[in-house]
Regions:
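Long, highly charged, low-complexity intrinsically disordered interaction regions
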Residues: 97-169
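Helix-hairpin-helix
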Residues: 157-184, 188-191, 195-196
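Short linear functional motifs in flexible/disordered or boundary regions
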Residues: 24, 66, 127, 179, ...
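Conserved AdoMet/S-adenosylmethionine-binding subsite of the radical SAM
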Residues: 1-124
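A short alpha-helix capping/helix-coil boundary motif
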Residues: 49-52, 143-144, 171-172
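A short, structure-level motif marking secondary-structure boundaries and short turns
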Residues: 56-58, 148-150, 162, 176-177
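Short secondary-structure junctions and interdomain/linker hinges
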Residues: 19, 122-126, 174, 188-189
């Protein structure tokens, strides 16, 4: 039930915010030790310091990739999750008749991870990645290449003038490569020899 999941994630987010506020208040108060007293160890954090994550089982219900990515984007934005993990459903013998009898292709899980990366690090929105017709990612093309082929009007890109956001949408250019291109552009115009 999506509503129940969202309510529990919201409650978790509020608890994390409260714990962080409480920690800030405690850190602001001066610590006074009695003469001869040994300092105590700090209490373990209530929530994981690295952030919260969740997992989605892909293929256990009729949810398409667009729905899964929209849910992931909402979890990242509204609940500030650090990571969403995807696992392909694996059927088990004598399971409920409501569950599928066949597992989805493992490549679907891989494509969802690629799309998730585009959401988190490349500035893509969930509705840009998954196609509107059917809502399923292509198993033949990675999501960034599929997006580029669906938007030929955005290409070619001038590497000497394009902003970071536009360069991140070029297939084959990752975050580090774009950062290096931008640094090289400060020194001089880019040449073909610079790109090899």
């Amino acid at each position: 039930d999506g509503g129940r999941i969202r309510r529990s994630m919201a409650a978790l987010r509020l608890s994390i915010d409260d714990a962080q506020a409480q920690k800030r208040e405690q850190q602001a108060q001066p610590i006074r030790l009695l003469p001869g007293a040994r300092p105590r160890r700090a209490a373990a954090p209530t929530f994981a310091a690295a952030g919260q994550s969740t997992q989605m089982i892909v293929g256990a219900d009729g949810a398409n990739d667009a729905t899964i990515l929209a849910t992931s984007a909402q979890l990242y934005g509204a609940y500030r999750l650090k990571r969403v993990y995807y696992s392909a459903f694996g059927p088990i013998p004598h399971a409920s008749a409501t569950l599928p009898a066949q597992a989805p292709p493992l490549l679907r899980e891989h494509r969802l991870y690629q799309a998730d990366w585009l959401l988190r690090f490349y500035g893509f929105a969930a509705d840009e990645i998954a196609p509107q017709a059917g809502g399923m990612l292509s198993l033949d093309l990675d999501p960034k290449t599929a997006w580029a082929l669906a938007h030929p009007e955005r290409f070619p890109v001038d590497l000497d003038r394009a902003p970071r956001e536009q360069l991140l949408r070029v297939p084959g250019l990752g975050v580090r490569a774009v950062t290096r291109l931008l640094m090289a552009r400060r020194a001089r115009r880019l040449r073909v020899a610079d790109l090899t």
